[in-house]
Amino acid sequence: MGQQWPAGEIARLILDGFDDYREHFRQITDGARVRFEQAQWQEAQRASAARINLYEEKVAQTRERLLEGFDESLLEVGQWPLVKSAYIALIDLRFDDELAETWFNSIFCSLFSHDLISDGCMFIHTTRPSLRNQPSAAQTRNYRPAGELHLALQAIFDDYRFDVSYEDLPRDLQRLEGQLRASLPDWICKDPQQCIELFSSVLYRNKGAYLVGRIYTPDEQWPLVIPLLHREGLGIQVDAAITDEAEVSIIFSFTRSYFMVDVAIPAEFVGFLKRILPGKHIAELYTSIGFYKHGKSEFYRALIGHLASTDDRFIMAPGVRGMVMSVFTLPGFNTVFKIIKDRFAHAKTVDRKTVIEKYRLVKSVDRVGRMADTQEFSDFRFPKAKFEPECLAELLEVAPSTVVVEGDTVLVRHCWTERRMTPLNLYLESASEAQVREALDDYGLAIKQLAAANIFPGDMLLKNFGVTRHGRVVFYDYDEICFLTEVNFRRIPPPRFPEDEMSSEPWYSVGPMDVFPEEFPPFLFADIKQRRLFSQLHGNLYDADYWKQLQDAIRAGKVIDVFPYRRKSPVE
């Protein structure tokens, strides 16, 4: 039967589904330039969400075509190694073969239960090289200043033109040259072998466009990112020259929306990014350019590789125990694993379905650098020996429907992964006075920037925010988030009688979406000193009118600027 079984036809239909997905992905991505040129910011947000949702839509369509096109023998899992072999032959000459493997995995998982997953039937381990050789000449552009940096910059912007003119290119190039000379060692700008290498395609995200590359000599290199802004009615402005690796890393952060960029050979571009950002895992780099499912595949491979090669064992994550989620981690792997508890604390009114919807919402909204990206997994299987006994006991106690022991294996039926950060409340306990001020200032900015993106965190307690390795404050607990425009911000009405103020119950009605910002200070800060400092830094967050003005701007269609980098000398 094996030779008669239609392995080749099944493989072909799976790949046809992938081609359909890739074509629609390209169409959405290719529209980014026009949206930037025409300042279509709301359309850009919709396109970003549509591209994220596209993957699951096309997987579902391909699954249906398979079920309609083949009889029940399609679900004979023992035959799927033949499909995998036929599929490998079909993708061997493709430029996006690693993405095609992930697509195959998605189709397999849509047809079979996760306990049937094996490397014989799908691509648990890739058959492709993890990184490719240097990008081809067509993928990058090279400029050699030979001591004449201003001429090289002029040549760059002769090549990177748009259908909208630059607002004042001579002014911007002069400022750009000054920033480069200030940020690089003096000798580098005089080195006759200095080269500026830029990726040929422009990267687009939200209201910005980005030239991405590096400055290098035979001995050293620096990343280079040049953000461009479209100042409506004026033209395009060259906004900055960024050469600091930490700052460039933040631009490609797990807290950002995904870039739109025309990439003919994804592995080559990721390899290019990896050379300028060696600290980034390729999972994060694939995700940053919209291939989040392949980023998930690379993350999983890194995880099973870590478990196989170390003595690391799962422990409960540091911090206050959550009322909805239970969080565990591996000390040597920079990730937390979040599961939904079977029973929530009485203070929580959400249910499991709502929590799942909230976490999935985060995937499709603009995270403005202030919400951690998540990956959702089903049926993780780990060796029981990889759990500290106290950790496993707690997980089994709070989530017995999600965490199950099967012999020597622990099955985690459903979880999310997020980048591990230091909880803000723990960070403040050991921070210096200057660090406390900086962290609280960034905490307030995080709340304001989320609000500008039409996101209200709901539960804004310090424990629900984390501090990244770059010192940025990021929100990561999503069970109460909602759109800002759904909230009814109110002032507390004056008491009717003196005894009203002494009552344990409010003397006014409170609706389910009512929020009283005046109540924030004691709710957010038990520490009086921190409460006073935050009032100095961001006291307007305690004013209902501040929030209402933001709501008005959002309802009017205004897309507010949130920059993923320090603006050094913006033009007003």
From Swiss-Prot:
A Pfam family that this protein carries is AceK_regulatory
Q: What is its EC number?
A: 2.7.11.5, 3.1.3.-
Keywords (alphabetical) are: ATP-binding, Cytoplasm, Glyoxylate bypass, Hydrolase, Kinase, Nucleotide-binding, Protein phosphatase, Serine/threonine-protein kinase, Transferase, Tricarboxylic acid cycle
Residues engaged in binding ATP: A317, P318, G319, V320, R321, G322, M323, K338
Where, per UniProt, does this protein localize? Answer: Cytoplasm
A Gene Ontology biological process term: tricarboxylic acid cycle
User: Keyword Hydrolase: yes or no?
Assistant: yes
One GO cellular component term of this record is:
cytoplasm
Tell me the InterPro entries matching this sequence. Answer: AceK_kinase, AceK_regulatory, Isocitrate_DH_AceK
Q: Which reaction does it catalyse?
A: L-seryl-[isocitrate dehydrogenase] + ATP = O-phospho-L-seryl-[isocitrate dehydrogenase] + ADP + H(+)
Record keyword Transferase present: yes
* A GO molecular-function annotation: phosphoprotein phosphatase activity
* Catalytic residues of the enzyme: D373
Q: Which HAMAP family match?
A: AceK
Described function: Bifunctional enzyme which can phosphorylate or dephosphorylate isocitrate dehydrogenase (IDH) on a specific serine residue. This is a regulatory mechanism which enables bacteria to bypass the Krebs cycle via the glyoxylate shunt in response to the source of carbon. When bacteria are grown on glucose, IDH is fully active and unphosphorylated, but when grown on acetate or ethanol, the activity of IDH declines drastically concomitant with its phosphorylation.
UniProt record similarity statement: Belongs to the AceK family.
What protein name is recorded for this chain? Isocitrate dehydrogenase kinase/phosphatase
Source taxonomy: Bacteria, Pseudomonadati, Pseudomonadota, Gammaproteobacteria, Pseudomonadales
Q: Which gene encodes it?
A: aceK
